[in-house]
A protein has these predicted regions:
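Short secondary-structure transition/capping motifs
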Residues: 53, 57, 79, 88-91, ...
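A general "terminal functional-core" signal
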Residues: 2-25, 30-31, 100-391
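Charged, often glycine-rich, active-site loop that binds/positions anionic groups
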Residues: 82-107
Length: 391
């Protein structure tokens, strides 16, 4: 499988043009997404459990935006206004019944599916999150920005067609990818999901679709259970266009780098997309309460650079990143800011984003070398994908 040839208009001209602006989509209304309170553990097991802030509190993206402001990153980005996704856009994936449920919950608050809390007035915020990623696509496909980062809440990659799931109400990146195809005529879209949890909703949407290549790097057997095995590679004409790379707990920079070099980059380049999209969750960081991986800000910089190189080589640099997970209250915002800093170029900043834990953060064994369990996982994923790709 090598993928169809690209439209000539989608490729970089190599003429040394001035880099296009980097876009940012952020709206203060995201901070009104009301996830309510959570519990430390299950009350059946921990009768002393106390309510705490929900892990997906929108305060985290607010902190990330504040950090980006303090370091002058947002000054070097073009602001892109978000808009609320309309029914016709949402119905490209979601069912009318799900839209009706979310609309009803707008008056009462509640759960939009399985663990997808929203408060009173939450429908507009959820539609705004989808529209923010769509607006990023608009800006990149129309040439107003070369790349764009949608810093949104609520996240989206777990949402299924008929229900929310895993803190996600609507599937932001799925709807935006369909928007890129329907409105901007992007024939082939690459979606890379590096969130620690598998993007089950995104896989579901495109499992039988050869026009969207979905690549997921995630912690093996975490959430949701039953999704993301290496053998899940697509169905029908879409077989070979789903690439699952489940990685063992504790995988760090070296393992992710190897996954990119052996699988992500060669397959992405052979697919040769018209648009690169990223479900840019940061919960694979070493300090996240909902994952057990070992990435640092440096890891997110490196993955961003590698995918930008794919976009530069295949589709004139067009890349859209959408915020997904990331729950470490103090560390996740640094990861978000590191991604944005990489897009604008750290050399343009008077004060680049520091690694909060200094050089020692990238000196652990998992940062320096690929462990045996990780090597086995990569070998298994590679064996599956060799059926479809010359890698």
């Amino acid at each position: 499988m090598s993928g169809a040839g690209n439209r000539s208009s989608a490729k970089a001209d190599g003429g040394g043009r001035t880099p296009a602006p980097v876009g940012l989509v952020f709206d203060d209304r995201f901070l009104t997404h009301n996830t309510g309170l959570g519990l430390v553990g299950d009350v059946a097991i921990y009768p002393f459990a106390d309510p705490i802030a929900h892990p997906s509190s929108p305060e985290l993206v607010g902190r990330a935006k504040h950090l980006m402001d303090l370091h002058g990153i947002t000054d070097r980005m073009t602001r892109i206004p978000a808009y609320e996704a309309a029914d016709d856009a949402l119905l490209a994936y979601h069912t009318p019944e799900h839209l009706a449920r979310v609309h009803a919950l707008d008056r009462t608050g509640g759960d939009a599916g399985e663990g997808s809390p929203m408060g009173v007035g939450g429908e507009r915020v959820a539609r705004l999150a989808v529209g923010a990623v769509m607006a990023a696509v608009d800006a990149v496909m129309d040439g107003h920005a070369g790349s764009a980062y949608a810093l949104v809440r609520p996240p989206g990659h777990h949402a299924m067609a008929g229900r929310g799931m895993g803190f996600c109400v609507f599937n932001n990146i799925v709807v935006a990818a369909r928007h890129a195809q329907r409105v901007h005529h992007a024939e082939k879209v690459l979606i890379v999901d590096w969130d620690v949890h598998h993007g089950n909703g995104t896989q579901d949407a495109f499992y039988a679709d050869p026009s969207v290549l979905f690549i997921s790097l995630h912690e093996d057997d975490l959430y949701p259970v039953g999704w993301g095995a290496a053998e899940q590679a697509g169905a029908g004409v879409g077989e070979g266009f789903t690439v699952n790379i489940p990685l063992p707990s504790g995988t760090g920079a070296a393992g992710y780098r190897a996954a990119f070099e052996r699988l992500v980059l060669p397959i992405a380049r052979r697919f040769s997309p018209d648009l690169v999209m990223v479900s840019a969750g940061q919960d694979a960081n070493a300090f996240d309460p909902l994952g057990r991986m070992a990435l640092t800000t440096g890891s997110y910089r490196e993955m961003t650079r590698m995918l930008r190189s794919v976009a530069d080589d295949t589709c004139a640099g067009r890349m859209v990143l959408a915020q997904e997970g990331g729950y470490a209250p103090t560390y996740a915002p640094y990861c978000s800011a590191a991604i944005a800093e990489t897009l604008v170029g750290p050399e343009t900043l008077a004060e680049p984003i520091p690694e909060p834990y200094g050089p020692r953060a990238d000196s652990t064994p998992s940062a320096r070398s690929v462990g045996l369990d990780c090597a086995r996982a990569l070998a298994a994923a590679t064996a599956v994908q060799k059926r479809y790709w010359a890698i």
